[in-house]
Amino acid sequence: MNNNITKKIILSTTLLLLGTASTQFPNTPINSSSEAKAYYINQNETNVNELTKYYSQKYLTFSNSTLWQKDNGTIHATLLQFSWYSHIQVYGPESWGNINQLRNKSVDIFGIKDQETIDSFALSQETFTGGVTPAATSNDKHYKLNVTYKDKAETFTGGFPVYEGNKPVLTLKELDFRIRQTLIKSKKLYNNSYNKGQIKITGADNNYTIDLSKRLPSTDANRYVKKPQNAKIEVILEKSN
């Protein structure tokens, strides 16, 4: 009798440990939470060092996640497994309008962690602001989106690819982050006094201007760049006084 009880205890403990192990994040290059540490700054932050740290952090990407809403109105998405999910913070009427059309549907997520992972028993939660788009499907054509840049005095010019894939739309959150991160890595932005300027996105019914002297406003995080394969993106860099 005692042996049977002991075996049941051991079996239960083993199953519990296996269940706990299954909540660990997969060791993948772009989807592993352990690789991305949160570095949050206020949207009005203008300190160059803070902006550099924020736009140099690692991002997370997820495909075909399910977006859902709690009874209290908060927006969430299941990530790679049911025990790993995200709280999607949404601000502004246009971002909310886009999100509301995606409830209970498959979505793609470009995530920057607003805080460190919240771990509780058998559950882990990430916190992102925006970055959610309709999930790309096999019917969506593959394309490459390029960016051109120059300084205001036009002493130098250049360009680089900022996105390659088949997302039907892109969020300002994703494009802003990818563009700034690339410019920081190439020492074109927040270096040698080039601490301000604009990202201009036009074409295909788009008309956006992003201020490089501060973080992207939270209300813009889930606004869409429509027909991105036809969009024109230009960065103008300016020196601070």
Swiss-Prot record:
It comes from the Bacteria. Coiled coil: none annotated. Residues 1-26 form the signal peptide. InterPro entries: Staph/Strept_toxin_CS (IPR006126), Staph_exotoxin (IPR008375), SuperAg_toxin_C (IPR016091), Superantigen_bac (IPR013307), Toxin_b-grasp_Staph/Strep (IPR006123). GO terms for cellular component: extracellular region. Keywords: Signal, Virulence. The keyword Protein transport does not apply. NCBIfam families: PRK13349.1. Interacts with host FPR2; this interaction promotes neutrophil chemotaxis. Acts as a pathogen alarming molecule by acting on host neutrophil chemotactic factors FPR2. Plays a role of chemoattractant and induces degranulation and oxidative burst in neutrophils. Belongs to the staphylococcal/streptococcal toxin family. This is Superantigen-like protein 13. It comes from Staphylococcus aureus (strain Newman). The lineage of its organism: Bacteria, Bacillati, Bacillota, Bacilli, Bacillales. The gene is ssl13.
